[in-house]
Amino acid sequence: MSPKRVLLAALALLGIGVLMVGGAGWWAVDHYTGKVDRIAGAFPTHVPPAQQPAPSKGGQTFLLVGVDSRSDLPTTGRDAKAPSWRYGAQRSDTMMLVHLPADHSNAYVVSLPRDSWVDIPGHGTAKLNAAFSWGGPPLLIDTVQRLTDVRVDHLAIIDWEGFKELTDAVGGVDLRVDGTVRHMNGTEALVYVRERKNLPRGDFDRTHRQQNFLRAVLTRTMTTRNLTNPVRAAELLDTLTASVSVDDRLSDADLRELLWDNRSVRPGDMVFMNAPVARTDTVKGQSVVLLDRAKSEALWAAMRNDTLADYVASHRTDRLGSGTR
């Protein structure tokens, strides 16, 4: 049996679209937003509104998900050839909450460890990534909202095939490995983000690699070759819209407005961090991550109140540095 494929959510549709508004032209964004695949019934409508988090006091929060589809066929985007979710067939191996503040000054990316030991509605306690396997997008969103008390405004999902396509679409990425910068194509970058056993902190370092990759994709997109060449820009947007699926509440008009409002955000304005962790443990024979509830609540409160800039300035966080590893 082949090793379990670990998938990075390269979910850069929003970020890359923002970067391309100024370079490729608004016409391209307007044209391609209509091609984005929509996921029907992504939200937990079975949960009464009174039991769901209140809207944030400013900005919007997205849940970005990378899934291990265990399929040789693409499962997300308009080119999908297999279902995006079947019971027990997929796990969300990468989950990031992305908060875009009301002042459009930054983007805050918070990774949720896939092995976080959490309450999953209707299933008791289990690893966070099991929620998608058992109940698809609605159960995962419900679980994340109950964990954080943060309203998830929108969802974006990409699978393994989409990850590789996205990397190759931007012309590959530059990542630092053992002190040397290497240029990687989609297949090579997948190996980079899958690595765990040979990293000092295992899954925690792999999470940083996932964040490094996302930043590298955005940086690569900013190259003159991608931004000033209409053909290259069109090819890139075509690949993005073919690979990524979003919830059906995110209309074409919403997406265009979102991209326009955040058009000045650049890779250097993105703040990457991890949800605070108390420790690792073994529960029911499984290696799990126990989140630090007190420290996590301060982070989630800042996200709810749209005050993440103040939070980052006053808290020591497990943040991604300026280099790569």
Give residue spans per PLM region.
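N-terminal hydrophobic targeting segments that direct proteins to the cell envelope
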Residues: 3-90
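Extracytoplasmic
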Residues: 57-60, 90-95, 104-112, 123-125, ...
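Flexible, polar/acidic helix-loop-strand segments at domain edges
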Residues: 60, 162-239, 244, 324-325
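C-terminal solvent-exposed extensions
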Residues: 72-73, 77, 184, 245-325
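Second-shell loop/turn segments in exported
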Residues: 83-86, 126-134, 149-154, 197-205, ...
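Sec-exported extracytoplasmic/periplasmic mature domains
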Residues: 99-102, 117, 133, 145-149, ...
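Amphipathic, coiled-coil-like alpha-helical scaffolding segments used for oligomerization/assembly
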Residues: 128-181, 249
